């Protein structure tokens, strides 16, 4: 059923379909599902905000963590905080009421925040892939990834993300409630007159999904070949090679995590766009949409788990300047420090 600013995946033969901005949508699924949805969003908020804020705070507090590579990783934390503060709180509040109680303004805010966070994350991973390719493969001789390059990379991620998320706010496509009608996203569902949804969805998928993915896969394809060649030729010291491998491994795991979280949502959205008129239930889009939102917690978790230097700094911050585990980490830290001086970036 299509309304002026909404689309509900249900034929209105019974006459019970109501605007998701004005009435509870309990006729779509059991009311308990909305309670579960609200609890899930609360979980993401109480985990996502502290770990991303801690990532931001610890990196800014410890000077040795302020490396060019970490600028991009900080950008990921900022993007996740946008999702948590601007999107998750709105969705949780809507789930508690069973409909989008904040109206179209809240829908635009939630859809914009969630999409912006996802786009910044994807383009940040593309920039990280380029950085890894340039540092490891050395297509440009004597090139060092410095602070100016990192700032340019961060600026690029925001420019591209805003180029994708602002148009629906000004009339090229739109944000509408989706799934159980408690979260909002791009209108993949309708051919509403005056919004040009078809052209925007094609633009979004090709320019803001396929292009960064092609960049990522190209860079890591070349990188894997270069790593094998360097290992065979022993062109660099073992310490340098180990440092670069650890950084690369962390970034690749971040890419895999992004794909695991967002690829189901993108696939379902593309299916709905290319099969408009097909029958599907409210959970068909709700499950992948809320699975994608979990991406806000995996990046800092990966960073904390795989970066010993950051982990030591975080423990020092949490224990008011002291690290009770310093003796256990001393050997690993000294190795990491040595690798940092040998590598052109700070190893993770």
UniProtKB/Swiss-Prot annotation:
Biased composition regions of type Low complexity, renumbered to the chain: 332-348
Bilayer disposition of the protein: Multi-pass membrane protein
Compartment list: Membrane; Cell projection, Cilium, Photoreceptor outer segment
Motif segment ('Ionic lock' involved in activated form stabilization): 131-133
Annotated spans, Disordered: 327-348
Keywords, ordered alphabetically: Cell projection, Chromophore, Disulfide bond, G-protein coupled receptor, Glycoprotein, Lipoprotein, Membrane, Palmitate, Phosphoprotein, Photoreceptor protein, Receptor, Retinal protein, Sensory transduction, Transducer, Transmembrane, Transmembrane helix, Vision
Keyword Hydrolase: no
Molecular function terms from GO: 11-cis retinal binding; G protein-coupled photoreceptor activity
Pfam families: 7tm_1, Rhodopsin_N
Family per record: Belongs to the G-protein coupled receptor 1 family. Opsin subfamily.
Protein name: Rhodopsin
Species for this entry: Sargocentron punctatissimum (Speckled squirrelfish)
